[in-house]
């Protein structure tokens, strides 16, 4: 297999702790399947603990997709079980995410981190799009620009 390809078995990867700004209710874990955007979309499995809560947030650099592998995921009050699918355009406030009994969620993003910084920005209420455009239109073009006071996420810890 060449350097532009990747093949692995997720079940063989040990989940590692990940710090998610504002998250409460237990220890969140991640299996980072592909972080190299040159090889394709950034792909991970997020393990939400029973009672886990991730506050409303957005991603500036690209869209994000969630597919519930097992357990329960609650997104802004709407419940999803295995097979549940959600997707959000860049700059779209989504969440809060919660799980009553725990969940494993396949997450696919166009871009996730650079220099150890995740593209994760806490928000308050769902932001309305600026006049004449989408929510992403009013965002800074550089996803690595500091977002002071909003709790940019840290890299996975292990």
Question: What is each residue range found by the language model?
Answer:
Residues 26-59, 79, 89-93:
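Conserved short histidine dyad/triad with adjacent acidic residue
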Residues 49-51, 74, 110:
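Solvent-exposed residues in well-ordered beta-strands and their adjoining turns
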Residues 1-40, 122-158:
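A short, N-terminal "cap"/entry segment at the start of jelly-roll beta-barrel domains
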Residues 62, 79-82, 90-117:
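Ligand-binding loop in jelly-roll beta-barrel domains
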Residues 85:
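An anionic, turn-rich surface loop/hairpin at beta-sheet edges
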Residues 59-75:
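Glycine- and acidic-residue-biased ligand/ion/polar-headgroup-sensing regions
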């Amino acid at each position: 297999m060449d350097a532009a390809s990747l093949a692995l078995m997720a079940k063989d990867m040990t989940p590692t702790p990940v710090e998610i700004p504002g998250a409460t209710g237990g220890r969140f874990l991640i299996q980072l399947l592909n972080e190299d955007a040159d090889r394709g979309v950034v792909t991970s499995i997020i393990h939400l603990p029973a009672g886990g809560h991730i506050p409303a947030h957005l991603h500036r650099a690209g869209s994000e997709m969630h597919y519930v592998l097992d357990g329960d995921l609650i997104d802004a009050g709407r419940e999803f079980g295995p097979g549940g699918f959600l997707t959000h355009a860049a700059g779209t406030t989504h969440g809060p995410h919660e799980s009553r009994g725990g969940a494993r969620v396949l997450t696919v993003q166009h871009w996730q981190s650079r220099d150890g910084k995740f593209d994760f920005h806490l928000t308050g209420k769902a932001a309305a799009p600026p006049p004449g455009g989408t929510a992403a239109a009013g965002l800074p073009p550089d996803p690595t620009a500091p977002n002071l006071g909003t709790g940019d996420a840290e890299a996975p810890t292990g």
